[in-house]
Amino acid sequence: MAPQLLLCLILTFLWSLPEAESNVFLKSKVANRFLQRTKRANSLFEEFRSGNIERECIEERCSKEEAREVFEDDEKTETFWNVYVDGDQCSSNPCHYRGTCKDGIGSYTCTCLFGYEGKNCERVLYKSCRVDNGNCWHFCKPVQNDIQCSCAEGYLLGEDGHSCVAGGNFSCGRNIKTRNKREASLPDFVQSQNATLLKKSDNPSPDIRIVNGMDCKLGECPWQAVLVDEKEGVFCGGTILSPIYVLTAAHCINQTEKISVVVGEIDKSRVETGHLLSVDKIYVHKKFVPPKKGYKFYEKFDLVSYDYDIAIIQMKTPIQFSENVVPACLPTADFANQVLMKQDFGIISGFGRIFEKGPKSNTLKVLKVPYVDRHTCMVSSESPITPTMFCAGYDTLPRDACQGDSGGPHITAYRDTHFITGIVSWGEGCAKKGKYGIYTKVSKFILWIKRIMRQKLPSTESSTGRL
């Protein structure tokens, strides 16, 4: 009411002036002396500072216009408002194949990478084996602008054209008894007693090892085979490939005159768990150079003796498969190189020494070991790393393979199927800081392995328990 009264008084005063008839309105500078816009009552200096989102929208419910005053930006306001109204619709990561999610009110929008479409980027336009293995469970093959999935031996391609269905109870690579949340590793801190026993060694030892692994329970490492002689018992490991073939390291073959193979064993003190098999033939890669007569592993390391460190043992009688005895799957070379060896971890197992120069384990040990990139691998080794080798293991943690584990499996799991990716070969000490385990790269020998295995196919009897 006061402003209106003031205005009337001003107009009356102006009307009384001599020139009022011709000058009803004042110039702006004069008028502004009398007429001023009233400030908002909630803050004297609010117009001169940026908004406060906590005061405006958290402590009290705000409108979109009030939020806009705070952010002073349409895009930021829209992003905030979509979450503020009904939560973040992108929190569940609904966009497939690395699509980008943008939240909306009651919905979301996926921005797909090139080659994908659909509300959730779920449809692949241009399929590539280089992208998520073409969504194939096992093997992927490019065919023009499409891909073709196939499966390991003993599996059938699913109706969706991508999945692989086991054709029998004992198809390769099936870990029937899962670990039930158990990890194939120990805590980061090793018991002080064991730590003091880890002795340094300046000489590489090719007869490798499992240090600080966990006990492998019955059925958890069903592809494990062990090589035994009549004098020392277990001296090397191996991997079951089929009812009549076991993969191992070539340097293991030179350690004794008579070799037998045991499968299904997890505890050497319980003879009932293992099955002893006689050897018919042994195939050693022709490029492998055996150590000189009288050569001792721990005295001198001869690199040429451990390039092409691969051999295949043929059984006289077939291996009978069960829940505790199952072969590992043989990958294709491309699948191993492009998919399996780009996973974070592989799995090794064996009865080797529990620490360097220590006693051998009475129980089968298993350990997850990370893949190591080739440059780091080569820099860490005093001896050359050839194309038939790769590194795996820990830089500082005392976890590794050790003497007695040589020839054993390096397994990589993909979509719950376990594939053979390496053979325990050699290393510079056991769990030595800055050193890694060296493994034979199986992908380099896929054709050689298949050629050997075709020489004698399993009979109907040898295929018992496997389709």
Swiss-Prot record:
Would the keyword Metal-binding turn up in this protein's UniProt record?
no
**Residues that make up the propeptide removed upon maturation:** 21-40, 182-209
Q: What is its main location?
A: secreted
Q: Provide the top EC class.
A: hydrolase
| Domain Gla: start-end pairs | 41-86
The record's subcellular location field reads: Secreted
Give UniProt keywords alphabetically. Answer: Blood coagulation cascade activating toxin, Calcium, Cleavage on pair of basic residues, Disulfide bond, EGF-like domain, Gamma-carboxyglutamic acid, Glycoprotein, Hemostasis impairing toxin, Hydrolase, Protease, Prothrombin activator, Repeat, Secreted, Serine protease, Signal, Toxin
The residues annotated as site (Cleavage) are: R209, I210
- According to the UniProt entry, which residues carry 4-carboxyglutamate? E46, E47, E54, E56, E59, E60, E65, E66, E69, E72, E75
Q: Which GO terms describe its biological process?
A: blood coagulation; induction of blood coagulation in another organism; proteolysis; venom-mediated blood coagulation
Residue ranges occupied by any Peptidase S1 domain in the UniProt entry: 210-454
Indicate the residues that form the catalytic site: H251, D309, S406
In its record, the post-translational modification comment is:
Gamma-carboxyglutamate residues are formed by vitamin K dependent carboxylation. These residues are essential for the binding of calcium.
Residues carrying a glycan = S92, N254
Question: What PROSITE patterns does the annotation carry?
Answer: ASX_HYDROXYL (PS00010), EGF_1 (PS00022), EGF_2 (PS01186), EGF_3 (PS50026), EGF_CA (PS01187), GLA_1 (PS00011), GLA_2 (PS50998), TRYPSIN_DOM (PS50240)
GO CC term (a single one) = extracellular region
Q: What is its EC number?
A: 3.4.21.6
* Reactions catalysed according to its record: Selective cleavage of Arg-|-Thr and then Arg-|-Ile bonds in prothrombin to form thrombin
Question: Can you name one GO molecular function term for this protein?
Answer: toxin activity
Q: What is the tissue specificity?
A: Expressed by the venom gland.
How its function is modulated: the record gives: Activated by calcium and negatively charged phospholipids.
What is the protein's known function? Snake prothrombin activator that attacks the hemostatic system of prey. This catalytic subunit is functionally similar to blood coagulation factor Xa. It requires a non-catalytic subunit present in the venom, which is similar to coagulation factor Va, to be fully active.
The protein's name is: Venom prothrombin activator omicarin-C catalytic subunit
Organism, as annotated: Oxyuranus microlepidotus (Inland taipan)
